[in-house]
From Swiss-Prot:
A GO BP annotation: viral genome replication
GO cellular component entries: virion component
Post-translational modification: May exist in multiple phosphorylated forms.
Presence of the UniProt keyword GTP-binding in the record: yes
Catalytic class of the enzyme: transferase
Amino acids binding GTP: 249-256
Compositionally skewed regions (Basic residues) per UniProt: 851-867
Catalytic activity: RNA(n) + a ribonucleoside 5'-triphosphate = RNA(n+1) + diphosphate
UniProt protein name: RNA-directed RNA polymerase
Taxonomic classification: Viruses, Riboviria, Orthornavirae, Birnaviridae, Blosnavirus
């Protein structure tokens, strides 16, 4: 370290800031923390994992097998996509699980950093700590304030670590999820709360309004196989968004989605055809044995890999807290996303563009988003307001702000909550303009009866252990939707109970009443007063103080709302409220880099330097500009990195063209007016925060008849929104369709009649009256048709269909390493004594297992779904 830090002035400044005494002569010895050596993971193999789970009474499952992956000709699987094969977009062969032998899968997660294995991974930002030290010792203003920020930053480095935790931390998280689902407030289905699918959908209209898929551009109906959503002749791709670099999951462990696109499509197509056959044979909710047998064959569609989430963890909780990602099987992700993504991607409806909406879906705190929230509170300081985003609920009442989180939100879900999501998407999203459904019976069965059990109360793979998942698997395609539904139900019951104050016992009693656990994360009393104080004390200098590209003279006061992790501060220069990342989160992000997020750039010359530039500029954007010491340090390091890149002759623009993909804040920067120059100035921050043009809402015109959740809950309580419980069959009847068509014809006929040229007021009123009556007739019939659809789907809202798997209590059997080996299907299909037997006897040549014979038949079927 430079001698500048060992001068008497520097040593005195640093020791005072850190509150240190009796330090050594060399500043570096005590200023720069040594790389952390994490404790040894107590769980080293599957036997120890099984014993840990058994001690905590966690349900382990008997191992199930998957047919070996076999290469098949892509052109034969998808004749209509031969053009993709010819162009090289698709490979000539496709792997599908259709071999004559089966194996029991295994997945061993990677945890970094590890005990006694030094690695650069997860190291703190040494350059930023050194730069902050230099800036602190050479600063002239506010040494006490900057000393506090410096100490907080170094404490963050000492107390936290970026990494993927431990096996014991993952298992501890599983056990904690089970305790939430089955413990003091066991999960309750909507039916146990007296809520029908239609009632939940009516509430979701207020908390998460949606429109038709694709918005004004339209979208193909849910009536085909997934491969038919690709049209090479027209260059159209209607598949949901796919992150190609992410894990493919079962049955392709170790591969990415980009490597297995055709494989996943082949599985989805085959599965859809099989479901279609079951539907044709009459497999409904009352008789679902055929579907159940089908799901037994495709059991792996409901088994996610238990992936450790790389995050900034507290070192003291390294062995007890590792967040899990339920890495869904790629085919499952495709099926669920095909139902939800086209709708949600075009339904960014929230508090900013839909009156009286309480949703924060698609909300961005920039572009005037934070200002809209704060000014709304200040405009009606004595009103009660609330907002919802997934498992986050915000309540403002009695001049106090409450930030509430569902406790381990995913653990509170039941399959019926996922079913409510399906019902809502089908009845409010997948409908035609005339009210008829834009889906067929096969997709309705997938959505209502199968999809819920694929991701809720399903299973996961950890090492070679197959385990029950309590609640929904975190990270599945519907995680947000299911969590948002849970929060909507909780807020609805809070309104029904008379809106008790969150501090009250009546409010906390909602946990037991709903089976939804929650905790109050933050509470700000006298919020209007706190906001006024922040305005009065707002800084007069710096980026958004006076409009100069300089750090402020002192830290701008913030009001820590914890609104999706953001605080609010007031800009005198812009005369508006702007977002800054919660200081604790900002320091954590600054202390521990996550590394280059854009995997496509890895290995390119200058990419790592470009990442440092993007990271520092992004930290400035999200709030670093508000803290003088942090801002000066980030700006200095960015300038040095730019010079470094310039000296190497590497143009920055070529590396940062898609710079937002290089940062952990990419979701926030999406659709913001940011140029590719990527240099944070006062003008840059002003463009970032100026109120932009709001997206036009995309809301189903047949719905959202009741404005506001409070009125909606009141109407539900009085029975005004209840649907008849009679079942009208899954498809609209021909009679229903004829009524719609007849009404539409009447409307069109009258609308096309020549209009009167008379100046007589009564003649013109006759024209208007005829049009009004025809329009009312059409809308009435369209809504009646929708009611038919609702009633039909209620017929599918009984118990969901799921594969039944026996429990395995023997830790030796469930963890025996032999299950990780590839075995003949006749001995590997979940039979424990065969798994533990000696030797391997392969089946005779050409002999296929029952499951393999089924798979062969499925491949040979070329018929599509038209039921």
């Amino acid at each position: 370290m430079s001698d500048v830090f060992n001068t008497p002035h520097a040593r005195r400044t640093i020791t005072q800031a850190l509150g240190l005494t009796n330090v050594s002569d060399r500043t570096q010895d005590w200023l720069l923390p040594e790389p952390w050596n994490p404790p040894m993971d107590p769980i080293k193999n599957s036997q120890e994992a099984a014993e840990y789970l058994q001690r905590n009474q966690y349900r382990m499952l008997k191992p199930r097998a998957i047919p070996e992956n076999t290469p098949l000709d892509t052109s034969e699987l998808f004749p209509h996509l031969a053009e993709f094969v010819g162009s090289g977009a698709f490979g000539t062969s496709t792997l599908v699980p259709a071999g004559s032998t089966e194996y029991i899968p295994r997945y061993y997660p990677t945890h970094k950093p590890e005990h006694n294995k030094p690695t650069p991974f997860g190291h703190y930002d040494v350059a930023l700590l050194k730069q902050m030290t230099y800036q602190l010792t050479n600063g002239k203003d506010n040494p006490e304030e900057e000393g506090t920020t410096f100490r907080q930053f170094r404490d963050t480095i000492v107390e936290q670590q970026y990494g993927s935790g431990t096996s014991q931390g993952q298992l501890a998280r599983l056990v904690a999820m089970k305790e939430v689902a089955t413990g003091r407030n066991p999960n309750k289905s909507p039916k146990e709360l007296g809520l029908s699918m239609e009632e939940i959908a009516t509430m979701l209209e207020q908390t998460l309004p949606i429109g038709q898929p694709g918005g004004d551009e339209g979208w193909p109906s849910l009536t085909t196989t997934l491969s038919e959503l690709l049209n090479p002749a027209e260059g159209m791709d209607y598949l949901p968004h796919i992150t190609m670099k992410s894990s493919s999951g079962l049955p392709f462990i170790g591969k990415t989605k980009g490597e297995t696109v055709t494989s996943a499509l082949a599985i989805c197509d085959t599965f859809l055809r099989e479901v279609s056959e079951c539907v044709k044979e009459g497999a409904m909710a009352s008789d679902n044995q055929k579907l159940q047998k089908l799901l037994q064959d495709y059991w792996y569609l409901s088994c996610g890999l238990l992936f450790p989430k790389a995050e900034r963890y507290e070192k003291k909780a390294w062995l007890t807290k590792t967040r899990n990602i339920w890495s869904a099987p790629f085919p499952t992700h495709l099926l669920l996303s095909t139902i939800s993504w086209p709708i949600m991607n075009s339904s960014k409806n929230n508090i900013l563009n839909v009156p009286e909406c309480v949703s924060l879906y698609g909300f961005n705190p920039f572009s005037g988003g934070m200002d809209a929230v704060v000014t709304n509170i200040l405009a009606q300081p004595d009103e009660t307001l609330f907002l919802i985003y997934a498992d986050n609920i915000y309540i403002y009442m009695d001049r106090t702000w409450f930030s509430i989180d569902l406790e381990k939100g995913e653990a509170n879900a039941t399959p019926e909550h996922a079913q409510a999501v399906s019902y809502y998407l089908l009845t409010r999203g997948w409908t035609q303009d005339d009210g008829s459904p834009a889906f067929n019976a096969t997709w309705a069965t997938i959505a209502m009866m199968i999809a819920p059990s694929l991701v809720v109360d399903s299973s996961c793979l950890f090492m070679n252990l197959q385990l029950k998942t309590y609640g929904q698997g975190s990270g599945n395609a519907w995680t947000f939707l299911i969590n948002h539904t849970l929060s909507t139900i909780l807020v609805g019951k809070w309104i029904e109970a008379g809106q008790p104050n969150p501090r009250s016992k009546e409010f906390m009693d909602l946990e037991a009443a709903t089976g939804i656990n929650f905790k109050i994360e933050r509470e700000i009393e006298g919020l209007p007063t706190r906001l006024q104080e922040a305005m009065d004390k707002a800084v007069h200098t710096g980026f958004l103080g006076d409009g100069t590209t300089n750090p402020p003279e002192k830290e701008g006061p913030t009001v820590d709302l914890d609104l999706l992790g953001w605080s609010a501060t007031y800009s005198r220069h812009m005369d508006m409220w702007v977002p800054v990342l919660d200081k604790e989160r900002l320091l954590s992000s600054a202390a521990y880099p996550k590394g280059l997020e854009n995997k496509d750039l890895k290995g390119k010359p200058g990419a790592e330097i470009a990442y440092k530039i993007v990271r520092n500029e992004a930290l400035l954007m999200v709030g670093g500009w508000n803290y003088p010491l942090i801002a000066r340090s980030l700006m200095a390091n960015t300038s040095a990195a730019r010079n470094n890149l310039r000296q190497k002759g590497v143009p920055l623009d070529t590396l940062t063209r898609d710079w937002e993909k290089m940062t952990e804040f990419s979701d926030i920067f999406e659709d913001l007016p940011i140029d590719t120059k990527l240099e944070v100035t006062s003008e840059f921050l002003q463009r970032l925060n100026l109120r932009g043009e709001r997206k036009q809402p995309n809301v189903n015109k047949h719905h959202l008849r009741t404005k506001g959740l409070k009125k909606c809950v009141s109407a539900l309580k009085q029975g005004a929104c209840r649907n008849p419980t009679t079942v009208a069959g899954l498809k609209l009847t021909a009679y229903s369709k004829s009524r719609i068509n007849k009404a539409k014809a009447v409307f069109d006929e009258i609308n096309n009649l020549p209009k009167t040229e008379s100046d007589d007021w009564s003649d013109r009123m006759d024209d208007a009256d005829r049009l009004m009556k025809a329009n009312n007739l059409y809308m009435r019939e369209a809504r009646s048709a929708l009611e038919d659809v609702h009633n039909s789907l209620l017929a599918l809202s009984g118990e969901t269909v799921k594969a039944k798997t026996p429990q395995e209590k023997s830790t030796e059997k469930v963890s025996n390493p032999v299950v990780g080996y590839r075995l003949p299907a006749e001995r590997a299909t979940g039979v424990q004594h065969a798994l533990l037997g000696v030797g391997v006897s392969r089946p005779s040549e050409g002999a296929l297992t029952k499951n393999a014979r089924k798979m062969k038949k499925r491949r040979e079927k070329a018929r599509g779904i038209n039921h």
